[in-house]
Amino acid sequence: MAFRVSISTFGKSLRVRRVANVSAPLANASPFLRTGWAARPPGTNNGHGFRFTPACFITSDAFLSRLAKGKAETDDTHYHHPASVLPDSAEQLSLLVKDPDQPENSKVLRVAIIGAPNAGKSTLSNQLLGRKVFAVSKKVHTTRARALGVLTEDDTQIILLDTPGLTTPTKVKRHQLEKSLLEDPWNTVKEAGLVVVMVDVSDKWACNKLDFEVLKCLTQHPDVPAVLVLNKVDLLKSKSRLLEITADLTCGVVNGRKLQVRRVIKPPWAERRTDREARTSGSGDEEKPGGDVADGEGSEALSGLSKEQLRALKTQQGWAHFKDVFMVSAVDGEDVETLKRYLVVGAKPGSWQYHSDVLTDQTPEEICTNTVREKLLEYLPKEVPYTMTQAIDLWHDRENGELDIAVKLYVKKESHMKMVIGQAGQMVARIAREAGDDLSTVFLREVKLRLSVKVKN
């Protein structure tokens, strides 16, 4: 097992001569570690404080060797640029059913990305695809139904299954959410060859404990390999906390090996005091996000777990069967690039499911309404965007290549309509402008989007 530290993640911590030590067998370290680029910060002459290439992960030596081999083999090959979505529904459907143009020795991997609502699943999918095709916002339940993205590179096809955040039957009923938000994540994991579990480490109430619904999902499918992705690490002030979070969420075990994390710059008496404080704060954190635990037994039928298993999971903090751990941030694309390389190298021989020009299985109209909804969630307060509906009045592809779209927004109250329109129409104009810009990048053409608002009786 090896631990590699991202420059971007631990940049501030590197001002200290020695910050943290990860105890793990390094006698047979991977060649990837021995030959990879490394630099030693000024003033460190004792072997500690090395700065390795960006992208931080914990993984087995054997896989690191495969990762290095795969990277070396693909550095000089042709890169398949991200595809675009065809703006015509019939053409998009025709492309989806078109025979795959797979090469000899093709490889494929289906990846289910799961996590609590607002963990950053859709953002990660967009970064991996190299193009924004999934709606994202700071509010929960932006993703309402499962959709997939297709990443094709050389002889490998990665199918990303973007899912709604795992939720409970109680919350679905309370907030009048679609049934798909409850069922889609569970069904997706059944089809996956790899599960990516996203955790927002900037959420101080939940970062030390896996979401209860996530634990149930992992427990039901222990045979599906899973990796942990710690997201938004750039927002964490104390970078050394990442080590503690990793230990908590993995139960101190990664790829079947125990992970020992301890401070090395404090005297023993200070270390003992820190341990006591950590245990005290840890017990408090476990109680904070207990809302999902309360109705765990209500989803017994969906999860397929017995009441005894569900009760046991209530006291479980992490998952001891993660194969690897990655740390990513929205500000550093190199971290995501390493995760992408991991997926490509981990793909197995098999037939492609889609033509290499396919980017997503969403229809152009679905992408449009999801993009508009993203902006509504971003700029409108409280429950307003959740109660709105949309209808596409116009979809016209001009001869000059421009795409004209007109969408009617329906609200329930006059007061909501005033919020959507804004002062002198500034709010609705802003939403139309930003949504139109996003659609232009998806369809690779100029998009003129017009929005109108109406109170629905």
UniProtKB/Swiss-Prot annotation:
SUPFAM superfamilies: P-loop containing nucleoside triphosphate hydrolases (SSF52540), Prokaryotic type KH domain (KH-domain type II) (SSF54814). Residues 270-290 have a biased composition (Basic and acidic residues). One of its GO terms (cellular component) is mitochondrial matrix. GTP binds at residues 115-122, 162-166, 231-234. Residues 328-330 are annotated as: G5. One of its GO terms (molecular function) is GTP binding. Residues 162-165 are annotated as: G3. Residues 270-300 are annotated as: Disordered. Residues 141-145 are annotated as: G2. Residues 115-122 are annotated as: G1. CDD domains: Era, KH-II_Era. Residues 1-18 form a transit peptide. It comes from the Eukaryota. It is a peripheral membrane protein. One of its GO terms (biological process) is ribosomal small subunit assembly. Keywords: GTP-binding, Membrane, Mitochondrion, Mitochondrion inner membrane, Nucleotide-binding, Ribosome biogenesis, RNA-binding, rRNA-binding, Transit peptide. Residues 376-457 form the KH type-2 domain. Residues 107-350 form the Era-type G domain. It holds the Pfam family KH_2. Residues 231-234 are annotated as: G4. Belongs to the TRAFAC class TrmE-Era-EngA-EngB-Septin-like GTPase superfamily. Era GTPase family. Probable GTPase that plays a role in the mitochondrial ribosomal small subunit assembly. Specifically binds the 12S mitochondrial rRNA (12S mt-rRNA) to a 33 nucleotide section delineating the 3' terminal stem-loop region. May act as a chaperone that protects the 12S mt-rRNA on the 28S mitoribosomal subunit during ribosomal small subunit assembly. This is GTPase Era, mitochondrial.
